[in-house]
């Protein structure tokens, strides 16, 4: 079954500690998995901050400053690209928390990783994202 791109385009995005860039702050393992190669030149066409257009859906992004897996610069680069393209966006960077914080509470905690995964200040991201989505789709 083939659907036109407009029929499968998301209406909005929620990106949590996302892998965005194939550049200096890349998470190389993700690009290796995506492309099947370690060739950095093959990664570049997939660098999302370079693919943002005014048609990119409104985007909510969040990250933690201390994410040791995916550098926070990924979120910051995407935020700048969205701003430059005039795409509505909301961005939050919480001061601490490792990669995969998820809900930041006991519900999504991995036993033994409480210091990295229990991040009370980040638990509000779901409420913030819901408010952003409501604002995008509420007619004024």
Mark where each language-model region is.
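Loop/turn elements at helix/coil->beta-strand transitions in domains of secreted/extracellular proteins
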Residues: 9-12, 56-59, 85-90
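Active-site-proximal beta-strand/loop segments in catalytic clefts of secreted hydrolases
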Residues: 16-19, 63-65, 94-97
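Residues at alpha-helix caps and immediate loop-helix transition turns in enzyme cores, especially N-
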Residues: 26, 71-74
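Conserved serine/cysteine hydrolase catalytic core
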Residues: 48-56
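Short beta-strand/loop motif that positions the catalytic acidic residue
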Residues: 55, 60-63, 67
């Amino acid at each position: 079954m083939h659907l036109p791109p407009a029929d499968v385009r998301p209406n909005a995005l929620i990106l949590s500690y996302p892998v965005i860039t194939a550049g200096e702050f890349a998470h190389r393992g993700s690009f290796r998995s995506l492309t099947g190669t370690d060739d950095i030149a093959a990664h570049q066409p997939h660098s999302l901050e370079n693919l943002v257009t005014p048609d990119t859906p409104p985007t909510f992004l969040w990250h933690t400053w201390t994410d040791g897996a995916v550098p926070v610069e990924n979120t910051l680069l995407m935020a700048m690209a969205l701003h430059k393209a005039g795409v509505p966006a909301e961005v939050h960077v919480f001061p601490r928390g490792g990669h995969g914080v998820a809900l930041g509470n006991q519900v999504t905690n991995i036993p033994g990783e409480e210091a990295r995964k229990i991040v009370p200040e980040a638990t509000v991201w779901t409420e913030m994202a819901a408010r952003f989505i409501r604002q995008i789709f509420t007619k004024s």
